C-alpha cells in the first residue's frame, strides 16, 4: 500500500494568503471612504500612487531574486502594505514621500529578510517611522477636515499639490495651511497635547474648532469606519480577537489610570479611542500575522503592550500619534513573548 508523504502543517485553512489579503482590503474600504470624505481626494491619489509603486517594486525585486513576479503579486501583500502606508500619511504629501516609504517597506523591511512570512517588523510601519523621522514637516502637514475649510482642495488641486507642489492658484501646501484663519492644522491629538502643555484645561481645549462632541471632527468617523471593518474581519475569522481587544484595553486602561492619578493632564479614553490611527492600528496593523505574537497568551500581552505604549507616546512622546512606534517596539518583543508563552507540550 502506498502512502503520501507531506511536511507539516497537515491541517490547513481553506483560505489562501490572497483570500485573506483581499478580505483585509475589502474591510478597509469603509475607512478609506471616510478619510476621503473628510480629508479630500488626496487620500485616493496617494493610494493609487502607492499601489502602483508597490507593485513595480515587488515585481522588480522578484525578478532580481530570479523568482516569478506574477506569483508574488497574486498574494496581494504588496497592495496591503501600500494601502496601509497611503492612508497613514497626510493626503497632500509630496509624491516622493510615498515612493521613498515603499522602497523601505518592500525592499528593506520585507525582501531583505527573505520576503513574505520572514519579516520580523511590519513593513508599512517601518516605512512610516522612517518617513516621520526623516521628513517631519511633510509627514505632519495634515489639512483640517473639509467641514472646517471654506474652499476644500479640488481633485485637480490635490493632484497638483501632490505632484507639483502648488495648486492652481500657485499656492504651496504650507501657504494653504497657514491661510486658514482661526483653525489649527494640527491633528486633534497634537492639538490636545499642545493645549494642555500651554496650561489650558480640558474643557477649554475641547472648545477648539477641530473637536466635536466626543473626539476630533472627521477622525472619530474614520475610526468608527475602521472599527466596522475590523469587526467584519473578526466575524469572518480573518483575524482573532486577542490582539485588537487587548490593544484597546491597554489604551483605555492606561488612559483611565492617568485620569485617576493626574486628572486634566491627558486626553480622555474616548479621545484616544477615536483619534489618530487607533482602530486602523488595532484591527489592520497590529494583527499582521507575520510580525505579531503566535500564542493566544502572547497575543494578549503583545496587544496590551501596544495599547499602553500608544498612550505613553501620545501623552509624553515627541510625536502626536504613537501607533507605528508602539507596533515596532512590540515586534521587537515578539520572540521573547513567544518564548515565555508557548503552550506546554503534551507529556512534558
Curated annotation (Swiss-Prot):
Q: Where in the cell is it found?
A: Cell inner membrane
State the GO CC annotations. plasma membrane
Q: Which GO terms of type biological process are on file?
A: electron transport chain; transmembrane transport
Task: List each coiled-coil range.
Answer: none
Q: Which keywords does this chain's UniProt record carry?
A: Cell inner membrane, Cell membrane, Electron transport, Flavoprotein, FMN, Membrane, Phosphoprotein, Translocase, Transmembrane, Transmembrane helix, Transport
EC number(s) per entry: 7.-.-.-
Q: Which residues cross the membrane?
A: 23-43, 44-64, 72-91, 126-146, 214-234, 243-263, 266-286, 300-320, 321-341
The kind of enzyme this is, by top-level EC class, is translocase
Q: Name the coenzymes or cofactors required.
A: FMN
Would I find Transmembrane helix among this entry's keywords? yes
Sites where FMN phosphoryl threonine occurs are at 187
Under the subunit heading, UniProt states: The complex is composed of six subunits: RnfA, RnfB, RnfC, RnfD, RnfE and RnfG.
Its function, per the record, reads:
Part of a membrane-bound complex that couples electron transfer with translocation of ions across the membrane.
By sequence similarity, the record places it as follows: Belongs to the NqrB/RnfD family.
By what name is this protein known?
Ion-translocating oxidoreductase complex subunit D
Q: What is the lineage of its organism?
A: Bacteria, Pseudomonadati, Pseudomonadota, Gammaproteobacteria, Vibrionales
Write the gene name.
Answer: rnfD
